[in-house]
């Protein structure tokens, strides 16, 4: 899903702003308490801002057309199915939208269980049968009902804080080491220090992405189980099998990727937001 690029860009912007602000205010590794506070403010602040604007961002980046008044039987069925599943799951009716894309995919987003959006691609809508689409919708409704949007935001906030804090602590250690071995004791200097911080942000960011991806994969299994309860296990297995036979998905904006039905394949499973479809099918059959 098109999440990866937007997530990286958003977090890199947060880290860059954090670096600039901390440099201006003179926050450094000698004031660990201040550094940690700033790291938490930027780490959680950026994550929650992304959550707050997630529906708006999804509509803009994906070109989602929200169904306010169904124009045909297909749209009417979509809205009625989501409404029924939302009632079963005990959540407020999400907005339902369609976005134009040939890929078989869908996603859920929004700041809370009572303020969410479920969107399906035109490719999925016309490339699957009703039972399979019903299961996909149930998967997305389960994401909303499980509170996955807030959960993943909290996890993202924690790892953002870790990246901001750890990168600057390590950069401070390197700066002190260079200073102690420099006759003039000048250390790295501002620009070299910021360059080191940027590189460390990238390295720690990769580790942080693995952590977020791990929790995202766990939430996918839970959403599959929820979909099996709402729509039926065989329908969910059929939907996953259909996705497995279809073409590989394109890149979905980062803010939607973890809560979609199908993730992009990766050479390293550690970086995948979704477990392989084969494993998801096996997990459902085991229950």
UniProtKB/Swiss-Prot annotation:
This is Protease HtpX. HAMAP family: Pept_M48_protease_HtpX. Its main location: membrane. Its cofactor is Zn(2+). Belongs to the peptidase M48B family. Binds 1 zinc ion per subunit. It is a multi-pass membrane protein. GO terms for cellular component: plasma membrane. Pfam families: Peptidase_M48. Its EC number is 3.4.24.-.
């Amino acid at each position: 899903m098109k999440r990866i690029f937007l997530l990286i860009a958003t977090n890199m912007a947060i880290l860059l702003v954090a670096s600039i602000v901390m440099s201006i205010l003179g926050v450094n590794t000698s004031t660990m308490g201040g550094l940690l506070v700033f790291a938490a403010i930027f780490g959680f602040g950026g994550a929650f801002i992304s959550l707050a604007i997630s529906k708006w961002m999804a509509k803009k980046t994906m070109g989602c057309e929200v169904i306010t008044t169904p124009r045909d039987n297909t749209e009417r069925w979509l809205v009625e199915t989501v409404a029924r599943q939302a009632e079963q799951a005990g959540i407020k009716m999400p907005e339902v939208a369609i976005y134009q894309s040939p890929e078989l995919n869908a996603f859920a987003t929004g700041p809370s269980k009572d303020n969410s959006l479920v969107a399906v691609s035109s490719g999925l809508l016309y490339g699957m049968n009703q039972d399979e689409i019903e299961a996909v919708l149930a998967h997305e409704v389960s994401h909303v009902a499980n509170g996955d949007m807030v959960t993943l935001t909290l996890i993202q906030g924690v790892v953002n804080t870790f990246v901001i804090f750890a990168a600057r602590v390590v950069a401070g250690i390197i700066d002190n080491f260079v200073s102690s071995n420099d006759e003039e004791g000048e250390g790295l200097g501002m620009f070299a220090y910021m360059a080191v911080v940027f590189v460390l942000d990238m390295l720690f960011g990769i580790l942080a992405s693995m952590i977020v991806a791990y929790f995202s994969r766990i939430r996918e299994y839970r959403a599959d189980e929820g979909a099996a309860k709402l729509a039926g296990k065989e329908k969910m297995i059929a939907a996953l099998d259909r996705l497995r036979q279809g073409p590989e998905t394109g890149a979905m904006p980062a803010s939607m990727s973890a809560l979609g039905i199908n993730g992009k394949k990766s050479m390293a499973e550690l970086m995948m937001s979704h477990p392989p479809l084969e494993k998801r099918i096996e997990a459902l059959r085991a229950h």
